[in-house]
């Protein structure tokens, strides 16, 4: 990723502050779905149960209008802010996944109407690039940075198009091809245009360079050699496009694909998959009960490549004192400056550090896209099935989260800031491209990424998600204090817009169909 795009990826907590227009949502009583450590799942968490019903009630009472009016009409259309697309995915991908699991066709059609309304904002791609793109012309990031203004912000496009492609793929077996304003055909065509534009000789050369790179090749703070979420999202788009094409054999011709263009896509997809494979580190841990041959496999992503990156300068510092303090100038109250209290030079880099757990939430929907479309990807692109992440590898990532990220405290669950298990400060004095001051996240400061990030859909983590559900709904003072300290998005008063958004991100991840994910 470019350094500037990395800066534009604001943490979830900061993005929630921009959800003010969701205040229309109403508070309601939450049923007590008691946490269980194994055994039968609470009936409240089944598809069709009260928790799913509450999610859709929130959606009907304010979520739909928030997307339609705030994200799309105000930010995307009026301001030209394509970060609205980024936030739409962050806030509502878990909702979409629940709608698909529970087979809510009408809800998916409702989401499709919202997504389709963004297609009118596509414009000719900048310069001599082919196809259409969402061009960022306003909003905090693109107004503040001349480097982003009037460009396609690749992060926003890949992330949103992965959401749209998943939605269209799920509907491809229900909506008849050739119908007026066919959402599936529209989305497949837009996916083709974008994938073809991103698949340049320069992009392929950069992928080959990164495939060959090793952590020791990173010499400075540059992100040039990183595996980023943009690559994961592109693979997810390829996966769901394959699902659409497999479900509708005539769709390829309708959206302008032929054998030659499919072969070109395969070459790009192969490189993307090789990069993910090269950056996946799998280890075998001894069985905790000492059983022979029963070791546990854990996996991490991009380990060691991020050790020198600016956001991770304090990753080995686990103290309570803030390394940087943001102070307002008394003479100029609008001016906030960062004052360093503890220099970063005092701390050695964490050698094996990779992604933080907030960005690693992309793995949830990335793996889901792969798993839903394995056969289709082999059928459509002719790729080697072994090039796809295996189910064992996916399980190893879940084991890593369970064994190294979680603090092993079921009564008071917290989660380390980094997927490696490192738990130092994150994003101290981070510049997100808007000139704001950020003191950073202390140890366990990204714990809210677990409930909002979708991790509870992983079978190994579901019971812990149910436990956290109980804690966030508890009226006990000790529980409320714990939530306020570590899960602030769930600590606000019922009816608060930020809390409603957090719950609409979290609760769908707990809902299962027939006891299965």
Predicted regions and their residues:
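Sec/Tat signal peptide C-region and signal peptidase I cleavage site
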Residues: 31-35
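N-terminal secretory signal peptides that target proteins for export/translocation
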Residues: 1-14
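Bacterial N-terminal signal peptides
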Residues: 18-29
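Extended ligand-binding groove/face enriched in aromatic
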Residues: 79-83, 87-90, 94-254, 412-448
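Active-site cradle of extracellular carbohydrate-active enzymes
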Residues: 190-353
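Low-complexity, Ser/Thr/Pro/Gly-enriched N-terminal "stalk/linker" regions
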Residues: 36-141, 194-216, 281-301, 487-517
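Structural helix-adjacent loops and short alpha-helical linkers that scaffold large soluble proteins
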Residues: 38-43, 52, 96-116, 166-192, ...
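CBM-like carbohydrate-recognition segments
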Residues: 83, 355, 376-517
């Amino acid at each position: 990723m470019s350094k500037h795009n990395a800066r534009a990826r604001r943490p979830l907590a900061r993005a929630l502050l921009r959800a003010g227009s969701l205040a229309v949502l109403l508070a309601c009583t939450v049923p007590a779905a008691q946490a269980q450590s194994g055994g039968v799942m609470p009936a409240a968490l089944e598809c069709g149960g009260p928790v799913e019903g509450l999610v859709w009630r929130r959606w009907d009472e304010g979520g739909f209008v928030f997307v339609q009016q705030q994200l799309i009409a105000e930010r995307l259309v009026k301001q030209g802010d394509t970060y609205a697309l980024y936030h739409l995915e962050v806030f509502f991908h878990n909702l979409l996944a629940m709608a698909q699991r529970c087979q809510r066709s009408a809800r998916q059609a409702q989401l499709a109407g919202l997504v389709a309304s963004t297609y009118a904002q596509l414009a000719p791609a900048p310069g001599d690039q082919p196809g259409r793109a969402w061009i960022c012309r306003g909003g905090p990031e693109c107004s503040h940075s001349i480097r982003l203004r009037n460009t396609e912000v690749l992060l926003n496009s890949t992330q949103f198009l992965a959401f749209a492609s998943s939605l269209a793929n799920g509907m491809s077996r229900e909506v008849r091809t050739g119908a007026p304003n066919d959402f599936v055909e529209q989305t497949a065509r837009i996916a083709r245009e974008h994938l073809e534009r991103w698949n340049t000789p320069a992009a392929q050369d950069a992928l080959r360079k990164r495939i060959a790179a090793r952590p020791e090749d990173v010499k400075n703070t540059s992100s040039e050699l990183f595996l980023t979420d943009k690559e994961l999202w592109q693979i997810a788009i390829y996966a769901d496009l394959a699902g659409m094409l497999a479900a509708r054999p005539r769709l390829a011709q309708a959206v302008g694909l032929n054998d030659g263009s499919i072969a070109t896509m395969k070459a790009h997809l192969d490189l993307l998959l090789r990069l993910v494979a090269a950056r996946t580190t799998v280890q075998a841990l001894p069985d905790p009960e000492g059983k022979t041959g029963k070791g546990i496999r854990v996996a991490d992503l991009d380990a060691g490549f991020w050790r020198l990156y600016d956001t991770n300068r304090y990753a080995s510092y686990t103290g309570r004192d803030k390394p940087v303090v943001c102070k307002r100038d008394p003479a100029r109250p609008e001016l906030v400056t960062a004052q360093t209290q503890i220099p970063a030079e005092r701390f050695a880099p964490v050698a094996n550090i990779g992604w933080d757990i907030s960005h690693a939430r992309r793995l949830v929907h990335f793996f889901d896209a792969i798993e839903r479309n394995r056969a289709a990807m082999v059928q459509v692109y002719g790729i080697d099935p072994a090039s796809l992440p295996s189910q064992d590898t996916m399980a190893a990532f879940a084991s890593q989260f369970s064994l190294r990220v979680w603090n092993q405290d079921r009564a008071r669950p917290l989660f380390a800031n980094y997927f490696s298990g490192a738990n130092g400060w994150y994003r101290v004095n981070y510049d997100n491209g808007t000139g704001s001051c950020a003191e950073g996240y202390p140890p366990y400061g990204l714990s809210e990424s677990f409930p909002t990030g979708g991790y509870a859909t992983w079978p190994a983590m579901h019971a812990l998600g149910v436990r956290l559900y109980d804690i966030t709904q508890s009226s006990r003072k000790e529980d409320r204090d714990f939530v306020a300290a570590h899960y602030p998005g769930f600590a606000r008063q019922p009816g608060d817009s930020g809390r409603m958004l957090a719950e609409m991100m979290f609760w769908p991840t707990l809902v299962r169909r027939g006891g299965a994910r």
